[in-house]
């Protein structure tokens, strides 16, 4: 097992990465024997993993209850959060309880947001089971739910007490979910690390075959990059916003199509293509780098074209509701080369529309 740390003073926490680590002693730190906890998962994962996780929690002496939610992005809502809060109250969980998120990004977001507001804040532990949540969503403290008018519009920053990344969970992950997670992996490489991008160009096929050694390295690399950013800019006041590369366009696709119609990583893949094309059109990104980004996304099996039934103009209202908008001005994360990105504002909307049209 390898351990990284997100350094945030008294709120620092470990990220544990390895194979079959869910059964290791003290893996559920900061929980101690006799502590109360609530496991939150969905119906699919409950059938696959709940008994195993329950066994190890009870073996550790934890008093554990459960909430089993519906499965899918369309259920990342305030209504599902109310299910969690009601269960906590009915089971008489106090302020020293710990919520445990067993699942992907949806479960992690719902659990984290619930933890942030239940009795004004309780601890929670992330046990991410998808590649997307292992490399991105479980680390950093962003929690929230969707609104009809936009993705993740209601939420809070609430850091977990620990993150437990067991790569064995990926062996039961549907292949399209694995591919979806690769979008966030590629994101890190494009905006932060040219060497990692080259490594992905060489190893993406074997990663998709779930080579343990390669996957452990890949997850660790992504978590290291994100942990460094979180330590410097926890509340996204500055360059943490770079992590939203592709998300302004991608969230528009998700909202327009209906949450759950496109997997998050699929929408972000197309969003990264659109952002890269925008950067090329304004003279920042070289055509060769644009083609390399496009090629790697294709190699990973990710979509590079937006939905045919969504016009370029229909992206703009969603993009203007993006959380990076300041004083009515759209701000976009654009790559300027492989391994570097910047935040741009004031880009001509006709250029943005052209980039979208070129990616349809």
From Swiss-Prot:
<dbReference type="GO" id="GO:0009423">
    <property type="term" value="P:chorismate biosynthetic process"/>
</dbReference>
<dbReference type="Pfam" id="PF01761">
    <property type="entry name" value="DHQ_synthase"/>
</dbReference>
<dbReference type="GO" id="GO:0046872">
    <property type="term" value="F:metal ion binding"/>
</dbReference>
<feature type="binding site">
    <location>
        <position position="247"/>
    </location>
    <ligand>
        <name>Zn(2+)</name>
    </ligand>
</feature>
<comment type="similarity">
    <text>Belongs to the sugar phosphate cyclases superfamily. Dehydroquinate synthase family.</text>
</comment>
<dbReference type="InterPro" id="IPR050071">
    <property type="entry name" value="Dehydroquinate_synthase"/>
</dbReference>
<feature type="binding site">
    <location>
        <position position="151"/>
    </location>
    <ligand>
        <name>NAD(+)</name>
    </ligand>
</feature>
<feature type="binding site">
    <location>
        <begin position="169"/>
        <end position="172"/>
    </location>
    <ligand>
        <name>NAD(+)</name>
    </ligand>
</feature>
<protein>
    <recommendedName>
        <fullName>3-dehydroquinate synthase</fullName>
        <ecNumber>4.2.3.4</ecNumber>
    </recommendedName>
</protein>
<keyword id="KW-0862">Zinc</keyword>
<dbReference type="Pfam" id="PF24621">
    <property type="entry name" value="DHQS_C"/>
</dbReference>
<dbReference type="GO" id="GO:0000166">
    <property type="term" value="F:nucleotide binding"/>
</dbReference>
<keyword id="KW-0479">Metal-binding</keyword>
<dbReference type="GO" id="GO:0009073">
    <property type="term" value="P:aromatic amino acid family biosynthetic process"/>
</dbReference>
<keyword id="KW-0963">Cytoplasm</keyword>
<comment type="function">
    <text>Catalyzes the conversion of 3-deoxy-D-arabino-heptulosonate 7-phosphate (DAHP) to dehydroquinate (DHQ).</text>
</comment>
<dbReference type="InterPro" id="IPR016037">
    <property type="entry name" value="DHQ_synth_AroB"/>
</dbReference>
<dbReference type="GO" id="GO:0008652">
    <property type="term" value="P:amino acid biosynthetic process"/>
</dbReference>
<dbReference type="GO" id="GO:0003856">
    <property type="term" value="F:3-dehydroquinate synthase activity"/>
</dbReference>
<feature type="binding site">
    <location>
        <position position="184"/>
    </location>
    <ligand>
        <name>Zn(2+)</name>
    </ligand>
</feature>
<feature type="binding site">
    <location>
        <begin position="129"/>
        <end position="130"/>
    </location>
    <ligand>
        <name>NAD(+)</name>
    </ligand>
</feature>
<keyword id="KW-0547">Nucleotide-binding</keyword>
<keyword id="KW-0057">Aromatic amino acid biosynthesis</keyword>
<comment type="pathway">
    <text>Metabolic intermediate biosynthesis; chorismate biosynthesis; chorismate from D-erythrose 4-phosphate and phosphoenolpyruvate: step 2/7.</text>
</comment>
<feature type="binding site">
    <location>
        <begin position="105"/>
        <end position="109"/>
    </location>
    <ligand>
        <name>NAD(+)</name>
    </ligand>
</feature>
<keyword id="KW-0170">Cobalt</keyword>
<dbReference type="InterPro" id="IPR056179">
    <property type="entry name" value="DHQS_C"/>
</dbReference>
<dbReference type="GO" id="GO:0005737">
    <property type="term" value="C:cytoplasm"/>
</dbReference>
<keyword id="KW-0520">NAD</keyword>
<feature type="binding site">
    <location>
        <position position="142"/>
    </location>
    <ligand>
        <name>NAD(+)</name>
    </ligand>
</feature>
<dbReference type="InterPro" id="IPR030960">
    <property type="entry name" value="DHQS/DOIS_N"/>
</dbReference>
<feature type="binding site">
    <location>
        <position position="264"/>
    </location>
    <ligand>
        <name>Zn(2+)</name>
    </ligand>
</feature>
<feature type="binding site">
    <location>
        <begin position="71"/>
        <end position="76"/>
    </location>
    <ligand>
        <name>NAD(+)</name>
    </ligand>
</feature>
<keyword id="KW-0456">Lyase</keyword>
<dbReference type="InterPro" id="IPR030963">
    <property type="entry name" value="DHQ_synth_fam"/>
</dbReference>
<keyword id="KW-0028">Amino-acid biosynthesis</keyword>
């Amino acid at each position: 097992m390898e351990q990284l740390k997100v350094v945030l003073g008294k709120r620092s926490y470990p990220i544990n990465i390895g194979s079959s680590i869910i059964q290791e002693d003290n893996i559920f730190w900061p929980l101690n024997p006799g502590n109360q906890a609530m496991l939150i998962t969905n119906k699919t994962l409950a059938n696959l993993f709940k008994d195993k996780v329950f066994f190890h929690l009870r073996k550790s002496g934890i008093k554990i209850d459960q909430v089993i939610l519906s499965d899918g992005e369309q259920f990342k809502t305030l209504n599902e959060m109310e299910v969690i809060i009601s269960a906590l109250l009915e089971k008489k969980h106090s302020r020293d309880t710990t919520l445990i998120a067993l699942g992907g990004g949806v479960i992690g977001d719902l659990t984290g947001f619930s933890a942030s507001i239940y009795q004004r804040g309780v601890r929670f532990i992330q046990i991410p089971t998808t590649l997307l949540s292992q490399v991105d969503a479980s680390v950093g403290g962003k929690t929230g739910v969707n609104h009809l008018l936009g993705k993740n519009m209601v939420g809070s920053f609430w850091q977990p007490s620990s993150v437990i990344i067991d790569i064995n969970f990926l062996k039961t992950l549907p292949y399209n979910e694995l591919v979806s997670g690769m979008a966030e992996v590629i994101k890190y490489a494009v905006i932060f690390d040219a060497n990692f991008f080259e490594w992905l160009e060489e190893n993406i096929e074997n990663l998709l075959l779930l080579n343990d050694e390669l996957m452990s390295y890949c997850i660790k690399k992504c978590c290291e990059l994100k942990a460094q950013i979180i330590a410097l800019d926890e509340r996204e006041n500055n360059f943490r916003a770079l992590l939203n590369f592709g998300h302004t366009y991608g969230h528009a696709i998700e909202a327009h199509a209906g949450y759950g119609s496109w997997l998050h990583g699929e929408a972000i893949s197309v969003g990264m293509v659109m952002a890269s094309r925008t950067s090329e059109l304004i003279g920042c990104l070289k055509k060769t780098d644009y083609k390399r980004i496009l090629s790697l996304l294709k190699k990973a099996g990710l979509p590079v074209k937006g939905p045919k039934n969504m016009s370029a103009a229909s992206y703009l209202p969603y993009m203007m509701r993006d959380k990076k908008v300041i004083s009515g001005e759209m701000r976009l994360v654009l790559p300027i080369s492989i391994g570097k990105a910047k935040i741009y504002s004031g880009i001509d909307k006709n250029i943005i529309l052209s980039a979208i049209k070129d990616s349809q």
